[in-house]
Amino acid sequence: MHEYEQIITQPIFFLFVAFSLVLTWAYFRGKRRNRELYVSVFEDLVRIFKPDDQKFTNIGGAIGYHANLYIRKKKAFLSRVDATITMLPRHSLLYLPISKLIRKYDRLFLELYLKNPPSEEGHFLEKRYARFSKTRVANLDKLEAETVNWGGYDFDLLYGSEQMRQKLLDFLAKNPDPGGIRHIALVPEQQKCFIFMIPKKKEVATTLQPVYNWLPSLVKNM
């Protein structure tokens, strides 16, 4: 018993207890912050896309969630939206700094299923994100490219015709702030639009609404 009494009076023991308490506090605080983020993001997505049915799935404990939004309205230009959000491990105080170096930020991937294909391929691709993520555009050799500044970020504008170029530039002119958007891809072959963005709580709807309003003008027979 005397040996145990000596241990619990050592400064290192109190440091251990204090560190354990900090880790516990960080765990619950981090989980709460991640929950607030994904709930806010999914609420914004539902508000924009107005699905008739929806399914939410946990894919990574406190850091990953997936949503399937089904749209059955006849006049809608979308039939489905798949969304995946992966977040920094805010609940893990020890791993969070490493994750920030490796992953840098939270991520929201959107896959929009179009009822009719886009008239042609087009991209907004932020240069720093493209280098970091090593994003590759499959038909890059068939597309023209130019660099534009969008809200202080350098983006590659990729297009196959002057008509598509003008549509992309018109969108930029009407929406000077990309928010968290780092890539928008219109892919006729897959009849889809892909969007990657860095999600912020209570900002996803504001960022995505202009894109949602713009897409029907790019889809055939709409």
Residue ranges with predicted function:
Residues M1-L15:
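Feature marks short, highly hydrophobic, charge-poor N-terminal signal-anchor/signal peptide-like helices
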Residues E3-Q6, P199-K200, T206-P210:
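Intrinsically disordered, low-complexity segments used for protein-protein interactions
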Residues P11-R29:
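Single-pass alpha-helical transmembrane signal-anchor segments
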Residues Y27-K104:
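N-terminal topogenic membrane-targeting module
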Residues R35-Y38, V204, L208:
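Generic alpha-helical secondary structure
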Residues L45-I48, F171, W214, L218:
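Residues that form generic nucleotide/phosphate-binding pockets
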Residues A76-T206:
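Structured extramembrane domains adjacent to transmembrane segments
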Residues T207-M222:
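Short amphipathic C-terminal alpha-helix that caps PH/PH-like domains
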